[in-house]
Amino acid sequence: MLHRNRFLVLLALAGLLAFLSLSLQFFHLIPVSATKNGGSSKSRKRIMPDPVTEPPTVDPVYEALLYCNIPSVAEHSMEGHAPHHYKLVSVHVFIRHGDRYPLYAIPKTKRPEIDCTLVASRKPYHPKLEAFISHMLKGSGASFESPLNSLPLYPNHPLCETGELTQTGVVQHLLNGQLLRDIYLRKHKLLPNNWSSDQLYLESTGKSRTLQSGLALLYGFLPEFDWKKVYFKHQPSALFCSGSCYCPLRNQYLEKEQRRQYLLRLKNSDLERTYGEMAKIVDIPTKQLRAANPIDSMLCHFCHNVSFPCSRSGCLGMEHFKVIKTHQIEDERERHEKLLYFGYSLLGAHPILNQTVNRMQRAASGWRDELFTLYSAHDVTLSPILSALGLLEARFPRFAARLVFELWQDRQKPSEHSVRILYNGADVTFHTSFCHDFHKRSPKPMCPLENLVRFVKRDMFVALDGSSTNYYDACHGEGA
């Protein structure tokens, strides 16, 4: 009996130790050898702190975590919120592609070992990931505008290629699509069950990461969609300016903005010292290190919780990362103050905002086509739009950022239409320059469509110099 009791005690103790070991591994408190699907077999130092509530002062690590946009708990969003007597008419969505592999490599360092195949059992997980892969395999004959028709429909390289969408990026947009589906289809019935291809407008730049992000969002929004009803148009310009891309004044603003960035960097002695330290570690000239845009690669290490690269002379570290990230935050602050980027944004964003307003006006008049519009784009697409709208407090577009324009009809006064603007789920309508003081002057709960129309058709040019009344004249005027 004594031996039996001792055996049971030892068995319970062994079970407790096993549980503690698994718990410690889960919380990254002891090293764990990763499988092929998890990355390198080496022990990896944990570099990513747990997200916390927003700190009282600007924290570069917290800002970087927001930028990573790691899929976690369900997101609280304000899309689709309106008084009960308003009817949703159309929705226009701009997205930045999801998490990607770096566009730049730090010379003389090992590339981060990130697996760009999609594995349903690997984190980050999504219940529809396996079904998404199966559906993409059925789309080999999809008819997209060239060159989109030659791009892969989902990422599939064991070692990611330059700029390739990762599994994290796919999951980010599956979640975006699922969120929009719950709000716009299940709640507001934006599209009928037998929706047609004419009711969608889909556009992507020619990068695989934007097409694949668009497809992931679309699958979350319309699971098992009919491939014959889906057509992505190709947009050659990251500004989505279509046939209105030639704009000399916009280019002048951009050149002066780039000059401002350069001068700010020269003034930052901490940044130059940090670049010098990093260059010494990897044994290259400081100028070469700076040209390699090391923050791009370091953000990939950070977002994927992989140790920063090392050489025989040492390792790049969190302090280097913090200095560069802090400079980025300071650059964004000064950018809004100097207004050069604002001038660039007004001209850069006008063509796509004009297209959006025209679609809204057609929908308001009863046109039933293009009720859901999706532009799959880049940070350099969303950032000018945010700036042009006057959203100066908006953070730089994170991975899988979304900007949504909603058009609503007042059922009590069917001729009246209103708009809502949402950025990453937050209602920013009354922070825009065209509606920031409307609620002070009117008891109406929504911003009139006319305000947005007037802003795009007139006020954007007034904000530039006041003398131009159309896009062509503004682009060929003087003012930068």
Curated annotation (Swiss-Prot):
Residues 28-480 are lumenal. The chain crosses the membrane at residues 7-27. It is found in: Golgi apparatus membrane. Gene3D superfamilies: Phosphoglycerate mutase-like. It comes from the Eukaryota. Responsible for the 2-O-dephosphorylation of xylose in the glycosaminoglycan-protein linkage region of proteoglycans thereby regulating the amount of mature glycosaminoglycan (GAG) chains. Sulfated glycosaminoglycans (GAGs), including heparan sulfate and chondroitin sulfate, are synthesized on the so-called common GAG-protein linkage region (GlcUAbeta1-3Galbeta1-3Galbeta1-4Xylbeta1-O-Ser) of core proteins, which is formed by the stepwise addition of monosaccharide residues by the respective specific glycosyltransferases. Pfam families: His_Phos_2. Belongs to the histidine acid phosphatase family. It is a single-pass type II membrane protein. This is 2-phosphoxylose phosphatase 1. GO terms for molecular function: phosphatase activity. The active site is at 97 (nucleophile), 379 (proton donor). It catalyses: 3-O-[beta-D-GlcA-(1->3)-beta-D-Gal-(1->3)-beta-D-Gal-(1->4)-beta-D-2-O-P-Xyl]-L-seryl-[protein] + H2O = 3-O-(beta-D-GlcA-(1->3)-beta-D-Gal-(1->3)-beta-D-Gal-(1->4)-beta-D-Xyl)-L-seryl-[protein] + phosphate. Interacts with B3GAT3; the interaction increases the 2-phosphoxylose phosphatase activity of PXYLP1 during completion of linkage region formation in a B3GAT3-mediated manner. Its EC number is 3.1.3.-. Signal peptide: none annotated. Keywords: Glycoprotein, Golgi apparatus, Hydrolase, Membrane, Signal-anchor, Transmembrane, Transmembrane helix. GO terms for biological process: chondroitin sulfate proteoglycan biosynthetic process; glycosaminoglycan biosynthetic process; positive regulation of heparan sulfate proteoglycan biosynthetic process. The lineage of its organism: Eukaryota, Metazoa, Chordata, Craniata, Vertebrata. Glycans are attached at residues 194, 305, 354. GO terms for cellular component: Golgi apparatus; Golgi membrane. The gene is Pxylp1. Residues 1-6 are cytoplasmic.
